[in-house]
Design a protein with these regions (language model features):
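ATP/NTP phosphate-donor binding region
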Residues: 1-94, 375
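A glycine/threonine-rich phosphate-anchoring loop and its flanking beta-alpha core
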Residues: 20, 115-216, 310
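C-terminal charged capping/lid subdomain of soluble metabolic enzymes
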Residues: 35, 315-421
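Short Gly/Thr/Asp-enriched flexible loops that form oxyanion-binding sites at enzyme active sites
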Residues: 53, 81-84, 103-116, 149-150
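Short alpha-helical scaffolding segments that buttress acidic/His motifs in well-ordered protein cores
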Residues: 199-203, 245-256, 293, 362, ...
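Active-site segments that bind and position negatively charged phosphate/pyrophosphate groups
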Residues: 209-361
């Protein structure tokens, strides 16, 4: 392992009905005036009665609050700025997002803006840094992004539709209330997209250039991915299966709090590429990741085919014999894994064959939960000009490349996006 810091200050309150405790938690962490941040006005947060329950809990704890709604997927900087303006005027000292990653990231952005005196664009483009944010608590309703325990946020700058991130431990929420029952109403597509995002947060850490022994972190990561693999297939068919929903919710947090990347360098190239898809086409984040990853993997797997082979064996049960026959074992996903035709290439080594079979196994799993594995399946058809624009934006301000497993230039990114069509 390489040297690492692991910091997880977020208090987790997990289980049915825990949202009733939100007021006490805000008080315990020093809050007085709360800004509640959530999605669509008149949406499920309101119609389900959840917002009313949160209001009551805050009032019972003697807290005042102001609501800010209107968060959308691929959250916009303009709403963050509106929240900063309102928060300063109202004397807000505590932020309470109710929702998933987009809502939480919006709250993190508002916290940075209230606590500091700079333009948010400067923070997102890396021109300034800060270690100051307001205190944040979360009522989680979507298992996906893991922002409830992470240090990072991703926001869309409407000028140029650029998605950019910033991360610091000061933005890690003080607490997160996680009731799996609050995810029962999610559509199957959103559930599956969330599961793909959870998987990808660990996969981005699993495919690493670090060549020291990280076997302990590997086993943690592989166990999490197997659990998500299975729970997702249950949850899309049985939306009120508590155990499947609980597994996804907890896995979402563990997948993005640093645990599955401890002691090694993470990649995150696929995330950076998908951010450009989200910025240009406003696609669901997890679905966009699923649509791109297979092409990224086939483009870079020769860098370390053994890593992909291990992924296939440990996560999808791919066994490969000396004769290069691929057979899923009993621990494989529900749908049979069909090797890619490319594995018949006589110039491929057995490790190459296993690596390519692993990539196909991931795509088979994606299809089993109705996730796309190409841009066409995602429902978008970027032109070559649009692809070149996305590739250019992807490396903008990043020293001309993204990723660490195999650093990618804008030419590499364009090639991957063309492969993904």
């Amino acid at each position: 392992m390489i040297n690492f810091d692991f910091f997880t200050p977020t208090k987790i309150l997990f289980g049915a009905g825990r949202e009733s405790e939100v007021g006490k938690q805000v008080v315990a962490f020093g809050g007085h005036k709360v800004m509640i941040v959530y999605g669509k006005k008149g949406g499920h947060i309101e119609t389900s009665g959840l917002l009313d329950r949160v209001h009551k809990s805050l009032s019972d704890a003697g807290l005042s609050y102001v609501d800010l709604n209107g968060v959308v997927p691929n959250p916009r900087l303009s709403l963050v700025k509106e929240g900063i303006r309102i928060g300063r005027a109202e004397g807000v000292d505590f932020l309470l997002p109710i929702g998933g990653g987009s809502v939480i990231d919006t709250a993190k952005g508002i916290g940075y803006g209230i606590a500091n005196d700079f333009e948010m664009e400067d923070l997102l483009y890396g021109r300034v840094k800060t270690d100051k944010n307001l205190s944040i608590g979360v009522v989680l309703t979507i298992a996906a992004a893991g922002s409830e325990m992470s240090s990072s946020m991703v926001l869309t700058i409407e000028d140029g539709m650029m998605k950019r991130s910033y991360g610091h431990d000061c933005a890690r929420p003080k607490f997160a209330i996680m009731n799996p029952e609050l995810t029962y109403s999610l559509p199957a597509y959103q559930t599956a997209s969330g599961a793909a995002d959870i998987m990808m947060h660990t996969m981005e850490r699993y495919f690493t250039p670090t060549d020291t022994d990280t076997s302990l972190t590997d086993r943690i990561a592989e166990g999490l991915m197997v659990s998500v693999r299975d729970a997702a297939q249950v949850a899309v068919k049985e939306p009120e299966n508590y155990e499947a929903r609980a597994t996804l919710m907890w896995a979402g947090s563990l997948s993005h709090n640093g645990l599955t990347g401890a002691g090694r360098i993470s990649d995150f190239a696929t995330h950076k590429i998908e951010h450009e898809l989200g910025g240009m086409f406003d696609v669901a984040h997890g679905a966009g990741l699923a649509a791109v990853w297979g092409s990224w993997a086939r483009y870079v797997y020769k860098t370390n085919p053994g890593r992909f082979a291990q992924f296939g064996k440990k996560v999808f049960g791919i066994n490969i014999s000396s004769s290069t026959n691929i057979t899923p074992n009993s621990d494989a996903p529900e749908q049979p894994i069909k090797p890619s035709p490319i594995i018949t290439d006589p110039e491929l080594t057995s490790t190459d064959t296993a690596a390519l079979a692993a990539i196909t196994a991931w795509e088979t799993w994606c299809h089993s939960i109705s996730m796309p594995t190409t841009l066409t399946e995602l429902g978008i058809h970027p032109t070559d000009t649009q692809i070149e624009e996305m590739a250019e934006k992807c490396v903008f301000g990043r020293n001309g490349h993204v990723g660490f497993f195999q650093p990618l230039t804008k030419e590499d990114i364009a090639a991957i996006l063309k492969m993904a069509k």
